[in-house]
Amino acid sequence: MDGARQRSSIRRALSHRNFAIFEAGLLPHYLTGWIQRVGAGWLAWELTESPAWLGVIAAADLAPMLVLAPLAGAWTDRVNPLPLIRLAQATIVVQAVAMSALTYVGWMSIEVLLALTIFVGCIYPFHSSARQSIIPATIAREDFAPAVALDSASFHSTRFIGPAIAALIIPLYDVQGTFIAHVGGSAICLISLLLLRLKPPDRSQARGRNLLAQVADSMAYATRHNGLRPILLLLTFASVCVRPLQDMLPGFAGDVFQGGARELAWMSSSVGVGAMIGAFYIAWRGGLAGLTRITMIGYAGSGLAALAFVATQNIWIGLLGCAGIGFFLNIMSTSTQALMQLATDDAMRGRVMSLYLVIYRGMPAAGALLIGFISSLFGLRIAGALVALISLAFLLTILPKQAAIAASFENPPRRP
């Protein structure tokens, strides 16, 4: 009976018209985004063969989230998020066109790649914040947890499929083919956003406050909440110590495993397979109870999987480590996202969820720079082992508080 109820929660989530259209449009955007990301990563490695440059490019993609996500969240709480995400999506299409065109005419260099990466990195805080605010408007509250997990499953299933497709495209059409694919996928997503029909939210209260004051409100809200504060700290350490290893995979493929674009695609796909399985598990189980415990398990598992990955030079064991990193990171991040969404007042959701974006999308930039710097001195494997051990050590400070954290979210959440 339990399994039937959990499967029913997935069907109910997909029965909502706007949610189904929204996810159907995001799917090709996610898919071709991963295709382009593999192409850009391999292009950066071909241009420089430098782990430090890989860290710089990864940081350029993610660092704007650190600065802009809080402002994007506050802005999203002041406006209708649907026109905002449409504008952001159109801009992403333009960036993909520029990547393709400049590669075709031979004007692409590491500096140009860096500039275009920074450009699109500045767009994604607004796109992601608007997306986070739109999801609750497309779904009934009782179907929200599986809806969040399904959105994550879409993202990570494409993380498995996208690199595999990129591995086929690059030998045939070079990296330019990956950029062209993203033009098409992003355009399809834009069309789906134009088909959404959502009631504009009431933003009258938010517009009366200073933008920076609203950002400060969200930070104070999260700091006072007995559950949000430690959960966000866990997310921070995972995002700095473990998640950046995914951005260093081109270096592991070429330097540690003595491979090329094929091995890079295998590793990226393995991370995606693990993450997809984790997301479908969260969607299948449904409900809020037990998500705090799953968050802790995911955090610990990601650190152990990272240690297993950096400890080997055998590609097959490395692929298992990649899958473990993807699985455990995703059950942690998806559970964290669902807990935060359901524990936060509607008027604060855009700003509070922007903190999630700052940490999970932005903090890996700092981690990538750190790993890149340590790697230039001691090698990728030692750098990866060091940050994984730091991640696991921090967990020991949070475990004694697990029961109190769970109570603040699940019994039901207490709001400050």
Language-model regions: role of each:
Residues 5-63, 220-271:
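Helix-loop boundary and gating motifs at the non-cytosolic
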Residues 110-117, 121, 146-202, 245, ...:
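Hydrophobic alpha-helical transmembrane segments
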Residues 21-22, 108-115, 231, 316-322:
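Short hydrophobic/alpha-helical segments at membrane-entry points of transmembrane helices
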Residues 119-131, 325-336:
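Core transmembrane helices of Major Facilitator Superfamily
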Residues 29-30, 61, 151-155, 159, ...:
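Structural signature of transmembrane alpha-helices in multi-pass secondary transporters
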Residues 51-52, 141-151, 261-262, 346-355:
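Loop-to-transmembrane helix entry/capping segments in MFS-fold secondary transporters
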Residues 57, 67-71, 78, 82-94, ...:
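C-terminal transmembrane bundle of multi-pass solute transporters/carriers
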Residues 2-3, 143, 194-220, 408-414:
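Flexible cytoplasmic inter-helical loops of multi-pass small-molecule transporters
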